């Protein structure tokens, strides 16, 4: 009996001791978070200090009575992390402080985070050297320190992190060589630093974009100067001397050289004669200024602005039988009077190169400005081309870019549109990230989504088969007041399928096999991706879209299931948004519904437009830019 009583007392004692230990550990976590709060400022850190448990605080996640995750992305945090703060959260597995304004070094007591798996600190202003202790953490899987101010060398002990699959160090101030890294990494980027030297052979299989913006050499970049493609220096000091007999030329060799020179001279004269005849013919054709196509610019770089004057195109023919046609066919003349010669002589500026052709800004002397699209790979005959263009020219909507005129010949197909001064939504979302850039606020983004939805809904209302065919952010153009207008509508059927965009661009619906045959439900999918891009700030074509290599819709779905919808939003959007983002989440869910895997599960564009109108109206009237 006494034995049973002693056993019961022991069990009770152990249980009480366990509760006390758990309470003590949670209190230790609470003190650590308060230390962070005292050093770091930001809206989410207005935690309820009266609560005994930190597990209900914003961004804090607990498991078994301990803090296991701290997620405060894009929360406007600033200041430096203290010793005795995060480093004392010894059960922490996930730390996400990305896209804030935190500065200073990474605290040395991060070495205590032996269970840490995921470290996301990108998009801050952390400085100092990258501590080597990060690569001694036994559980670490992903490290993202991109877009900070880290300096010094990449630690030599990277290979100590045996479970590491992601290492992002781009856009810092790192210097020196890249150490040999033999880990089976799945994601890697050190671009836009001050690194130098040869790229280790273990990293040579990564794309150029992982290393650009440094002074590195070796695969996949240019060959290092010390390396010789032939394996040695030709004609170097170790080259054996030739025999003396080779210094003397035989009579046969001399005769061969003379004959070769004579033949070469005759060929040169023949070429000069042909060039002179061609030049005389071209002098009879009026000189024209024509823009030369340029390579497509990336979404993260500014498109170069330059005027290029080249040899005029071949003589324009108005039909495939060869009849001359120098006339533009106009749909709208309210933009101003001009003819083909005037258009080709106008001051031209390269805007970019897309999937259907190159675009230029044409400025006339009298002040008129238009946009010209030079189509490429047109595969339909003239009659079908003209019929198609007349259908497009008859369309009129406030959110469609106006098709002013077109020109058709065997060698040239030109479309003339109204010019949109603010450029494309893609350039604004993913272009210059400098201090002078003004980000789009919520009201403006909602207005852009609504304008684009109305335009596409109008296209679909023409009949049951009319679709846009190429919806993406670079085809959403903006006016001075940030009014959205949709461009490149209805052109997919007349362009070669090899030129039409494919699924790699991130907007294409999964059921599409022929890029020239896009259904209205496929348009809805592409528009859904556009909404997600507008709210997350992530390009669907970005290589580092997320850390699993999935497309944008699946990434949004995955994050919202594991965390909260707010975790996927563009930090530039949440930073300037007042408390409460219910309408943002509503629009995000509309975008997700549009990207349903099966076409029948997607709403119609009319329904999408109605839903966005409700969101927009409950948000108030749009303002163009953030305060």
UniProtKB/Swiss-Prot annotation:
Residues 222-246 are annotated as: Disordered. It holds the Pfam family Pkinase. ATP binds at residues 351-359, 373. It is a multi-pass membrane protein. GO terms for molecular function: ATP binding; protein kinase activity. It comes from the Eukaryota. LRR repeats lie at residues 91-112, 115-137, 139-161, 163-184, 185-206. Keywords: ATP-binding, Leucine-rich repeat, Membrane, Nucleotide-binding, Phosphoprotein, Receptor, Repeat, Signal, Transmembrane, Transmembrane helix. It is found in: Membrane. The keyword Transmembrane applies. The modification Phosphothreonine is found at residues 444, 595. The modification Phosphoserine is found at residues 347, 424, 519, 621, 626. The chain crosses the membrane at residues 253-273, 389-409. InterPro entries: At_inactive_RLKs (IPR050994), Kinase-like_dom_sf (IPR011009), Leu-rich_rpt (IPR001611), LRR_dom_sf (IPR032675), LRR_N_plant-typ (IPR013210), Prot_kinase_dom (IPR000719). Its main location: membrane. Residues 345-620 form the Protein kinase domain. Residues 1-23 form the signal peptide. One of its GO terms (cellular component) is plasmodesma. SUPFAM superfamilies: L domain-like, Protein kinase-like (PK-like). The protein kinase domain is predicted to be catalytically inactive. PANTHER family: OS05G0588300 PROTEIN, PROTEIN KINASE DOMAIN-CONTAINING PROTEIN. Belongs to the protein kinase superfamily. Ser/Thr protein kinase family. This is Probable inactive receptor kinase At3g02880. It comes from Arabidopsis thaliana (Mouse-ear cress).
């Amino acid at each position: 009996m006494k034995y049973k009583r002693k056993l019961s007392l022991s069990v009770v004692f152990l249980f009480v001791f366990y509760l006390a230990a758990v309470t003590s550990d949670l209190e230790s976590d609470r003190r650590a978070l308060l230390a962070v709060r005292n050093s770091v400022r930001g809206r989410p850190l207005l935690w309820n200090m009266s609560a005994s448990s930190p597990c209900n605080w914003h961004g804090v996640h607990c498991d078994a009575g301990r803090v296991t995750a701290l997620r405060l992305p894009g929360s406007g945090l600033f200041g430096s992390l203290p010793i005795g703060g995060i480093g004392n959260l010894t059960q922490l597995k996930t730390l996400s402080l990305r896209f804030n304004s935190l500065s200073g070094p990474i605290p040395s007591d991060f070495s205590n985070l032996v269970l840490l798996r995921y470290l996301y600190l990108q998009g801050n202003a952390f400085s100092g050297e990258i501590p080597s202790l990060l690569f001694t953490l036994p559980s670490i899987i992903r490290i993202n320190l991109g877009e900070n101010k880290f300096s010094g060398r990449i630690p030599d002990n990277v290979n100590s992190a045996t479970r590491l699959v992601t290492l992002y160090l781009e856009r810092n101030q790192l210097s020196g060589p890249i150490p040999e890294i033999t880990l089976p990494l799945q994601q890697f980027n050190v671009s836009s630093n001050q690194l130098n030297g040869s790229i280790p052979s273990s990293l040579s299989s990564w794309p150029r974009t992982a290393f650009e913006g440094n002074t590195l050499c070796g695969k996949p970049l240019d060959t290092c100067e010390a390396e010789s493609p032939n394996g040695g220096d030709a004609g170097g000091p170790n080259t054996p001397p030739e025999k003396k007999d080779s210094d003397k030329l035989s009579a046969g060799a001399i005769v061969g050289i003379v004959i070769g020179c004579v033949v070469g001279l005759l060929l040169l004269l023949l070429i000069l004669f042909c060039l002179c005849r061609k030049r005389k013919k071209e002098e009879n054709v009026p000189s024209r200024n024509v823009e030369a196509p340029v390579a497509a610019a990336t979404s993260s770089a500014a498109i170069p602005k330059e005027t290029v004057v080249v040899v005029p195109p071949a003589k324009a023919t108005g039909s495939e039988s060869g009849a001359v046609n120098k006339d533009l066919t106009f749909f709208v003349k309210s933009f101003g009077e001009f003819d083909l010669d005037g258009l080709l002589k106008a001051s031209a500026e390269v805007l970019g190169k897309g999937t259907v052709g190159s675009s230029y800004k044409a400025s006339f002397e009298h002040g008129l400005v238009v946009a010209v699209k030079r189509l490429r790979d047109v595969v339909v005959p003239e009659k079908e081309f003209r019929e198609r263009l007349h259908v497009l020219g008859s369309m009129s909507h406030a959110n469609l870019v106006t098709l002013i005129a077109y020109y058709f010949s065997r060698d040239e197909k030109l479309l003339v549109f109204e010019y949109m001064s603010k450029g494309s939504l893609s350039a604004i979302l993913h272009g210059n990230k400098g201090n002078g850039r003004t980000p789009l606020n919520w009201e403006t983004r909602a207005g852009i989504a609504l304008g684009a939805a109305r335009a596409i809904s109008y296209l679909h209302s023409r009949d049951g088969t009319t679709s846009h065919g190429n919806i993406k952010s670079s085809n959403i153009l903006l006016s001075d007041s940030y009014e959205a207008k949709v461009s490149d509508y209805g052109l997919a059927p007349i362009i070669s399928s090899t030129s039409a965009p494919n699924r790699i661009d991130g907007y294409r619906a999964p059921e599409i096999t022929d890029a020239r045959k896009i259904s209205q439900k496929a348009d809805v999918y592409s528009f859904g991706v556009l909404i997600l891009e507008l709210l997350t700030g992530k390009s669907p074509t970005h290589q580092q879209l997320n850390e699993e290599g999935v497309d944008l819709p699946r990434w949004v779905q995955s994050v919202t299931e594991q965390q909260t919808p707010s975790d996927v939003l563009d930090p530039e959007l949440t930073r300037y948004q007042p408390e409460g983002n219910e309408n943002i989440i509503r629009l995000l869910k509309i975008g997700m519904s549009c990207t349903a895997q099966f076409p029948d599960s997607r709403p119609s564009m009319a329904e999408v437009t109605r839903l966005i109108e409700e969101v927009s109206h409950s948000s108030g009237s749009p303002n163009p830019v953030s305060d």
